[in-house]
Every structure is written in C-alpha cells, then in structure tokens.
A protein has these predicted regions:
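Sec/Tat signal peptide C-region and signal peptidase I cleavage site
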Residues: 25-29
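Bacterial N-terminal signal peptides that target proteins for export
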Residues: 2-15
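Bacterial N-terminal signal peptides
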Residues: 12-24
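Extracytoplasmic/lumenal domain signature
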Residues: 30-336
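Mature extracytoplasmic/luminal segments of secretory-pathway proteins
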Residues: 2-5, 21, 239
Length: 336
C-alpha cells in the first residue's frame, strides 16, 4: 500500500518539463560530464540524479516533431537537448526549446543518445547504423550493423562502445567506430547494456536470456527466463543485477549469476528499474502498478495507475520518484 504523497500531471503529447531528473554529473572518464549524458543517467543505469527536485512543475515549452518520440533525451554540456523521433530524425534543441539542427537517418530513431567526453553524440537508428555526430551535426563516423538499433549505447571508461541490435548481436566497437567483437544471441537485442565497475557487461535479449560478458568478449554466465528481456539491467552498488522480464517477474541476481530474489507481478515488465541511495528499487509493470522494494526483496509499497507502466523511473536528489504511465499521466512519488 502506498503511504505518502503522489502528484501527477497529464501528458497528452511529447512535453518536456525542465525537471531536475535530467540534471546530473557523470562519474565515468569517457562519458561527458553533463547534466544527463546517457540513457538512465550512468553506466549502471541507476536513473538517479544528484540534483534537487521541483515542488511545482511549470510547463516551459513544447517541441513538436513529425512522429512519436520514444527516445529518451540526453543533455549536453551547454544545455543542448538531444533525442530521436520516429520521423527518422535525430534532434538537437536549445534549453529554451528552439531547434538547433535535425539530422535525418533512413529509419526511425528510438535509441537514446549517449554523449562522449569530447562532445561526440552517439545513437542508433532503425537504418542499422550507429551514428557518431559532432556537435554541429556533421558525421564523425558511422558503424553499420545487420539490423535496426533500438538499444542505447554505453561508453566504457576505456572508450569501448557497447550496444545491441536487431541482428541478434551485442556489438563492441572502438571509440573510432571499428569492430572489436560481437556476441551472438538467438534473438533481437533491444535491452541497453549496463557496465559494472569491473568492466563486466550485462544485457537482456529477445531469446529470454540475461547475459554477463567480460570486456574482451568472453561469456561469464547467462540466465534464461520464460519470455522477452527487452528492459535494461540495473547494477546495484553491491554488484547485484536487477531486471524485469516479460515473463512477469522482476529478477535480482548476484554477480555470479545466482538468483538473489524474484517478484511476480503477474504481467509483463518492460520498465527498466531505478535505485535510490538506500538501495531501494523502483519499477513499473504491465499490471498498471509501480513497485518499490527494499534491497533484500521486501515490498515497501505499490501504487496502481490507470494503465500499464512501461516508463522507466527517474529519481531526484530529494528522493522523489518520477514515472509515467499509459494513462497519460506523469507521477511524482514521495519515497516513503
């Protein structure tokens, strides 16, 4: 049962609030030191910001594209906001919502961008390319896979870039776009890889498996669930790996691949989890609910919205949890 306060806001279209969930700093050498440089904020996918949360959101502006926006934005050092759209374009807009430039690809852009320390912006497209753009929209380089790229790139401290593709492979490429290695799975990879402090890479696959890889491309372990793993993993400070599956279960694994605990929501989980500074985990489910768990798997609270929750939560420095629902509302939860 939910104990404290909740605020929600109607979201009938793609609307950008200047929420502090996008205001953070990077802890990784090759990732830009910007407010929100990549999908889920950092390589461990905590979804957590060190900046304070707002008490009363004010709509500052709306930017209209020609297609749905499922790509999550990244924020550059100068405040530029980068994101993709299903209109085949990748956008750069100013902090006050004005268009700087739009880069056209040959496919929908659902991949969320990552910004490198040198300012290079990385993102994938359904045209099978991973693009590296300069800040003026010129192409630094591009890498071609054999399938569409929805997975969001992760930039390791050594500069290696990891991402999944519809070609059923996890790709590891150098910082100048050259192939290092691939790991073949039995189905598409939508899940965005998370990277542990020791360099281990974790990602889910459409073949129902969670994979753990070494930086040099050797498999550490894999675990089979009963359905798709399109959500992206979260890595806890103690090394545990947290991920939801479309088999309706939320899994927490130890770093050696052993299951620590699970929770059955009775409906698919596409939401990628977030973790607060106390180790509590938050995620949404197709059963319309948002869940909060303690690090050892005890249910703290749950809250039922008006529709399924595939949105991934983000957390402000004051602990406020932000998450959207298909009921067209953005919710802000008191952590207690």
């Amino acid at each position: 049962m939910f104990k404290k306060s909740v605020t929600y806001f109607g979201l009938p279209a793609f609307i950008l609030f200047l929420l502090p969930i996008f205001l953070s700093t990077s802890l990784y050498a090759q990732v830009a030191d910007t407010p929100w440089p990549m999908f889920r904020h950092d390589l461990q996918h905590t979804g957590r910001s060190p900046y304070g949360s707002i008490q009363k959101p004010i709509l500052k502006w709306v930017f209209q594209t020609q297609g749905p926006v499922t790509s999550s934005p990244a924020i550059g050092e100068d405040g530029t906001i980068y994101f993709g759209s299903k209109d085949n374009k990748f956008y750069a807009i100013t902090r006050d919502g004005k268009l700087k430039w739009a880069f056209e690809t040959q496919g929908e852009v659902e991949s969320s961008p990552a910004i490198r320390k040198d300012g290079t912006i990385l993102f994938g497209s359904w045209d099978s390319h991973l693009y590296a753009l300069n800040a003026d929209s010129s192409i630094h380089w591009k890498y071609k896979s054999e399938g569409g790229i929805i997975s969001s790139p992760a930039i390791a401290p050594d500069g290696t870039i990891y991402f999944g593709s519809w070609d059923k492979k996890l790709h590891a490429i150098t910082q100048d776009g050259k192939l290092k290695w691939t790991q073949k799975t039995a189905d598409h990879i939508v899940s965005s890889p998370a990277i542990a402090p020791d360099g281990s890479i974790y990602f889910g696959s459409g073949d129902y498996y969670l994979f753990a890889m070494k930086p040099e491309g050797k498999a550490i372990w894999s675990f089979g669930t009963r359905y798709l793993l399109d959500a992206s993993p979260l890595i806890a400070p103690n090394g545990n790996i947290c991920i939801g599956s479309e088999d309706a279960k939320f899994y927490v694994f130890r770093s050696d691949g052993q299951v620590e605990w699970t929770f059955d929501t009775l409906y698919d989980i596409d939401s990628s989890a977030a973790m607060d500074t106390h180790g509590n985990v938050y995620f949404g489910s197709g059963n319309n609910s948002i869940y909060a768990f303690t690090p050892d798997g005890k249910l703290r609270w749950s809250f039922e919205t008006g529709a399924s929750v595939s949105s991934s939560p983000a957390i402000g420095a004051d602990g406020t949890i932000y998450v959207g629902s298909r009921d067209k509302k953005l919710y802000a939860f008191n952590p207690d």
